[in-house]
Amino acid sequence: VKWTDKERAVILGIFSGLDYEDIGPKALVRCLIVYPWTQRYFGTFGNLSTPAAISGNPKIAAHGVKVLHGLDMALQHMDNIMETYADLSILHSETLHVDPDNFKLLADCLTITIAAKMGHCFTPDTQIAFHKFLAVVVSALGKQYC
């Protein structure tokens, strides 16, 4: 993947202003509520029976933060995201058996959550760069499934 200087600046700018403790949980909670079938991967996380239970679940919140911090690896290795995520791809495919389509769903929920937080600053140009970044990450996470 080729990144323009503008794309790099936009992506790094988005993450430099993020409150991981806020955005990570909100994105994962949104995914689990909007796409309830994704809850099956979180059976050990306790009560996920209602949107309120999911929103108030500390294990879900902690995992949302972990997922968002997982994107830091991609930020640090933007020119080699596929190789950077090779081990995570194996983990999610061979050990956790996560349906790779769920990565796209979470990416969409993360985009919505960040757009809501950034408001008018989340311009179409910002979305283009962010979407490209997440598409590369989603592809890297799903690589092992091919």
UniProtKB/Swiss-Prot annotation:
It comes from the Eukaryota. The keyword Ribosomal protein does not apply. Heme b binds at H63, H92. Red blood cells. GO terms for cellular component: blood microparticle; haptoglobin-hemoglobin complex; hemoglobin complex. Residues 2-146 form the Globin domain. One of its GO terms (biological process) is oxygen transport. Keywords: Heme, Iron, Metal-binding, Oxygen transport, Transport. One of its GO terms (molecular function) is metal ion binding. The keyword Translocase does not apply. InterPro entries: Globin (IPR000971), Globin-like_sf (IPR009050), Globin/Proto (IPR012292), Hemoglobin_b (IPR002337), Hemoglobin_oxygen_transport (IPR050056). PANTHER family: HEMOGLOBIN FAMILY MEMBER, HEMOGLOBIN SUBUNIT EPSILON. Heterotetramer of two alpha chains and two beta chains. Involved in oxygen transport from gills to the various peripheral tissues. This fish has just a single hemoglobin. It displays a weak Bohr effect that is not effector-enhanced and shows a propensity to form disulfide-linked polymers in vitro. Belongs to the globin family. This is Hemoglobin subunit beta-1. It comes from Lycodes reticulatus. The gene is hbb1.
